[in-house]
């Protein structure tokens, strides 16, 4: 049943590259086979409940520009929001969605009321999933917006806040499991510090390790089969976050013995804030064995903060999905559009248009990445660059020879290597040919 919010807009269809219909896909064809698998199954698109239906469009200099009929802290408004959200999911045709608890329920007076509201909405989501075929990619708890979390959740100096946050996560994991969620995400927006003058760094890291260990322990206790994911971000809102980037998260997981239990959910915008490319973070996660999922968006490269725009750079998407394919593709993860409309994009159809453009951009990137992989366009030059390590001397360097033996061979054989071209321009031109 239509809520009327989207007017007479019909379900988005694939119309091909020649279409000029802004409410149709030009490149995303869910059933198209890429590397032996349906495009939908490669990309596993998800809609973010928070940016699409809970965000009011505000910024530090102005209040909310969006006027949505569900913008109130009442359970009936939350139910209307659910109706509109699932209508949107059906129109768009993305197979998954994601949410924070605070996105979907009113803010209650206490923990018990929050839990009651969440369970009431989960009852509704269960029915709507059964009716529409929608699936939950991941759930999470909002441990950063309420003023109780000003100094963090897991890293808060007040043990009562730690306990409240832990209890909240427990209810959110329960909700995620009930809804068949394939992952559970932790993003530490307030897990960090503003100044070291009032921060016990060692204690806070240990508390964060304890918190994550409790999450993993509870996952196994209740038989939740999904993946636990950490989402790295270097700053904003906190001056310095403890889950700064993929490398930092991996070091943290290793320190607390969780590297085999937890993977990463990598957001493009957060990679940029950390001074990395999206491709770098994906490649490193793949190399370290902790690649899990993607939050897809982009930042404005001039602004210096997290702008959460829909992706529109095909070469970036091609290199990103090339790393995803090298990792073997998604298992429980997917491509969640952690992207929001611009403040002046007021019309309901703008929400569809933003997602359509993002899905088309990702589809083009995936197809280019698949062709590069099939043709060996990047792997063959890479193999040639490192070919010396496959020879007898290269293998002995990596296992068997001591430092003094290496020195002896260098002198005896008069080894005097000369540099070889890295061929960067050639490789960049190859990528441009595919996109």
From Swiss-Prot:
Binds 2 magnesium ions per subunit. Keywords: Carbohydrate metabolism, Cytoplasm, Isomerase, Magnesium, Metal-binding, Xylose metabolism. One of its GO terms (biological process) is D-xylose metabolic process. Its main location: cytoplasm. GO terms for molecular function: magnesium ion binding; xylose isomerase activity. Its EC number is 5.3.1.5. It is found in: Cytoplasm. Gene3D superfamilies: Divalent-metal-dependent TIM barrel enzymes. It catalyses: alpha-D-xylose = alpha-D-xylulofuranose. The active site is at residues 100, 103. It comes from the Bacteria. Its cofactor is Mg(2+). One of its GO terms (cellular component) is cytoplasm. Mg(2+) 2 binds at residues 267, 270, 306, 308. Mg(2+) 1 binds at residues 231, 267, 295, 338. Homotetramer. Belongs to the xylose isomerase family. This is Xylose isomerase. It comes from Brucella canis (strain ATCC 23365 / NCTC 10854 / RM-666). The gene is xylA.
């Amino acid at each position: 049943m239509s809520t009327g919010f989207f007017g007479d807009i019909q379900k988005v269809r694939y119309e091909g590259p020649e279409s000029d219909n802004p409410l149709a896909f030009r490149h995303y064809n869910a059933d198209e086979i890429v590397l032996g698998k349906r495009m939908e199954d490669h990309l596993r698109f998800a809609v973010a409940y928070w940016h699409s239906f809970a965000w009011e469009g505000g910024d530090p200099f102005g209040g909310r520009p969006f006027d949505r009929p569900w913008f109130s802290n009442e359970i009936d408004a939350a139910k209307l929001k659910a109706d509109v959200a699932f209508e949107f999911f059906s129109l768009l045709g993305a197979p998954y969605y994601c949410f924070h608890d605070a996105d979907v329920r009113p803010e209650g007076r206490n923990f018990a009321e929050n839990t009651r509201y969440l369970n009431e909405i989960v009852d509704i989501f269960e029915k709507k999933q059964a009716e529409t075929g929608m699936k939950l990619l991941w759930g999470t708890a909002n441990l950063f917006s309420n003023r109780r979390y000003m100094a963090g959740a897991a890293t808060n100096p007040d043990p009562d806040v730690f306990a409240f946050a832990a209890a909240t996560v427990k209810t959110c994991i329960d909700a995620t499991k009930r809804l068949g969620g394939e992952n559970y995400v932790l993003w530490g927006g307030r897990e960090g510090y503003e100044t070291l003058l009032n921060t016990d760094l060692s204690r806070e890291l240990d508390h964060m390790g304890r918190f994550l260990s409790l999450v993993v322990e509870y996952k196994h206790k209740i038989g939740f089969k999904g993946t636990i994911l950490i989402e790295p971000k270097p700053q904003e809102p906190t001056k310095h976050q403890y889950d700064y980037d993929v490398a930092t998260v991996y070091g943290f997981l290793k320190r607390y013995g969780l590297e085999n239990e937890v993977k990463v959910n990598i957001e493009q915008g957060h990679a940029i804030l950390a001074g990395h490319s999206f491709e770098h973070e994906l490649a490193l996660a793949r190399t370290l064995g902790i690649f899990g999922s993607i939050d897809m968006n982009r930042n404005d490269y001039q602004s210096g903060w997290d702008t959460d725009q829909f992706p529109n750079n095909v070469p970036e998407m091609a290199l990103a999905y090339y790393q995803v394919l090298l990792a073997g593709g998604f298992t429980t993860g997917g491509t969640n559009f952690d992207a929001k409309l611009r403040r002046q994009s007021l019309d309901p159809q703008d929400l569809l248009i933003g997602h359509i453009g993002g899905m088309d951009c990702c589809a083009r990137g995936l197809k280019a990445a698949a062709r590069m992989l099939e043709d060996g366009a990047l792997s063959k030059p890479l193999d040639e660059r490192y070919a010396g390590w496959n020879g007898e001397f290269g293998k002995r360097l990596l296992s068997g020879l001591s430092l003094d033996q290496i020195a002896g061979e260098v002198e005896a054989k008069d080894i005097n290597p000369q540099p070889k071209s890295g061929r960067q321009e050639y490789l960049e031109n190859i990528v441009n040919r595919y996109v």
